[in-house]
């Protein structure tokens, strides 16, 4: 059994590196794998606050910035987070961090960690590409908000959390174009590919370990959003 998890940078490092969370997250994963050592997990790390701080700084330094430059900066932040998570998952993670899901790579351990890839592609997109590569029909997206909302909850007090949504309706919310540093519930390009692949996605606040454990145990009584075709 394989689980593919997008671990948002805002979960790893909301204001500072979330050491206790990473320990608890590791404990949950180790427990799940030790129940059946054939189980495997792929973790794709986002850049989060670190990426946005560097990107925002660069935009101020060079107002004539190009989006590819911003993406390259953000990708490096995902790689830093990936190294931290990869090393934290020893001894069940023994393979090198993957930065290109289109290439062949080793997956000898129980846990594989991946980072950002190249300009124009978010870690959401990479998560969906891993699902395609391994013929998995579902993914888990761990973010720092409880659910997907019908509009930005940081801007609108009347934003409503959605327990279920289709990929088509999500596309209407997130739009069709990806911009570096975007703080969307899911990357628009990844949304389009996920619809094509008929994926099921669980989106939830990764900081709530007990809630995440419900998803691991296939208990649909969790706080979050399920995305389906």
State what each model feature region is:
Residues 1-229:
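C-terminal catalytic "cap/lid" subdomain
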């Amino acid at each position: 059994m394989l689980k593919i998890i997008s671990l948002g940078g805002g979960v790893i490092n909301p204001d500072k590196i979330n050491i206790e969370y990473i320990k608890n997250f590791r404990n949950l994963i180790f427990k799940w794998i030790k129940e059946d050592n054939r189980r495997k997990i792929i973790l794709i790390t986002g850049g989060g606050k670190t990426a946005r701080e560097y990107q925002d700084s660069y935009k101020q330094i060079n107002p004539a910035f190009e989006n590819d430059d911003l993406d390259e900066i953000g990708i490096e932040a995902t790689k830093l987070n990936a190294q931290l998570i990869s090393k934290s998952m020893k001894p069940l993670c023994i393979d090198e961090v993957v930065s290109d899901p289109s290439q062949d790579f080793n997956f000898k351990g129980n846990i594989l960690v991946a980072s950002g890839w190249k300009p124009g592609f978010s870690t959401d997109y990479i998560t969906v590409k891993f699902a395609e590569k391994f013929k998995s029909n579902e993914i888990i997206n761990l973010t720092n908000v409880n659910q997907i909302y019908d509009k930005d909850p940081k801007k609108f007090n009347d934003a409503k959390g959605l327990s279920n949504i289709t990929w088509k309706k999500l596309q209407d919310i997130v739009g069709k174009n990806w911009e570096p540093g975007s703080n969307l519930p899911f990357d628009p390009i990844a949304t389009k590919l996920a619809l094509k692949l008929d994926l099921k996605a669980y989106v939830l606040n990764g900081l709530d370990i007990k809630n995440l454990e419900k998803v691991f145990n296939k208990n649909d009584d969790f706080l979050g959003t399920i995305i389906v075709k």
